[in-house]
């Protein structure tokens, strides 16, 4: 795991074994654990309390036309962050027995400095009054590693007024630190 962005990889070990029929090698998962050292984001043994599979795949290429204008059922976004080559999404959506949770790169922006990445979440509307926590982890390396990419613009119907969340590369020359001597009091 990584703490954030391109931070060093951390390896966790546990005496608790996960059942291979529930968790396949290479599958992204969420863990609930306590580090035995008491220090988060350090390699070492942990006490594992729970593990859950996470939805996700590689980012797919698409267009507004091919995705019904990025049509998505409502999902409240709690957080979006990048860890290495993965974009991780945490939110709440309607319970679904067959959720369709995908991340698309708008193919018309593939070579842009800030390609547009769209989250599409569709439920089967079986239990309309129930909601549940949703985790997704998507491999965005095919976009992130492009030479023209300085970051991405993440779009979702769960973001106010059709806005986006910018996710920038750390070495992005467009990022300038604020001047601490400038008063911006309103």
Tell what function each PLM region has:
Residues 1-186:
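First exposed extracellular module after export/assembly in secreted or surface-exposed proteins
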């Amino acid at each position: 795991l990584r703490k954030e962005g391109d931070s060093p990889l951390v390896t966790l070990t546990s005496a608790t074994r996960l059942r291979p029929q529930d968790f396949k090698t290479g599958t992204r998962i969420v863990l609930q654990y306590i580090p035995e050292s008491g220090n988060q984001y350090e390699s070492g043994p942990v006490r594992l309390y729970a593990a859950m599979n996470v939805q996700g795949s590689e980012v797919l290429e698409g267009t507004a036309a091919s995705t019904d204008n990025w049509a998505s059922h409502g999902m409240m976004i709690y957080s979006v962050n990048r860890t290495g080559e993965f974009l991780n999404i945490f939110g709440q959506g309607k319970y679904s027995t067959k959720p369709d949770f995908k991340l698309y790169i708008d193919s018309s922006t593939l070579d842009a400095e800030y390609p547009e990445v769209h989250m599409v979440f569709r439920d089967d509307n079986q239990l309309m009054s129930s909601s549940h926590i949703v985790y997704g982890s998507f491999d965005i390396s095919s976009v992130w590693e492009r030479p023209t990419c300085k970051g991405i613009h993440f779009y979702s119907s769960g973001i106010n007024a059709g806005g986006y969340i910018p996710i920038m590369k750390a070495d992005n020359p467009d990022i300038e630190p604020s001047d601490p001597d400038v008063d911006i009091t309103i």
